[in-house]
Amino acid sequence: MIQTESRLEVADNTGAREVMCIKVLGGSKRRYASIGDIIKVSVKEATPRGRVKKGEIYNAVVVRTAKGVRRQDGSLIKFDGNAAVLLNNKLEPIGTRIFGPVTRELRSERFMKIVSLAPEVL
């Protein structure tokens, strides 16, 4: 569960290392985001020669949460930390590589690109 002010690691090669959630998109009073939800983020830590700079605002999709996701068969998939992939205004990934596993819940029409780039789909 990600909420405003939550810090997430970045799971792509855009040059951002850490981002902070500044808004959960989808509804005026929506408080939490989980895997597959789109959030608005601010870059808090970036590498020197990356595509993105510290302080810039982007859309991002949550790909891993410590809270996890419950499957239809009753199983629960949890991760060690929270991670997101940065998106442009057309909701396409900015980076060309994805690091770490992602869940099958991202296999919607919108995020097939992320699933195809990921090294492992759980």
From Swiss-Prot:
InterPro entries: Ribosomal_uL14, Ribosomal_uL14_bac-type, Ribosomal_uL14_CS, Ribosomal_uL14_sf. Keywords: Ribonucleoprotein, Ribosomal protein, RNA-binding, rRNA-binding. GO terms for biological process: translation. One of its GO terms (molecular function) is large ribosomal subunit rRNA binding. One of its GO terms (cellular component) is cytosolic large ribosomal subunit. Gene3D superfamilies: Ribosomal protein L14. SMART domains: Ribosomal_L14. NCBIfam families: rplN_bact. Binds to 23S rRNA. Forms part of two intersubunit bridges in the 70S ribosome. HAMAP family: Ribosomal_uL14. Part of the 50S ribosomal subunit. Forms a cluster with proteins L3 and L19. In the 70S ribosome, L14 and L19 interact and together make contacts with the 16S rRNA in bridges B5 and B8. PANTHER family: 50S/60S RIBOSOMAL PROTEIN L14/L23, LARGE RIBOSOMAL SUBUNIT PROTEIN UL14M. Belongs to the universal ribosomal protein uL14 family. This is Large ribosomal subunit protein uL14. It comes from Burkholderia multivorans (strain ATCC 17616 / 249).
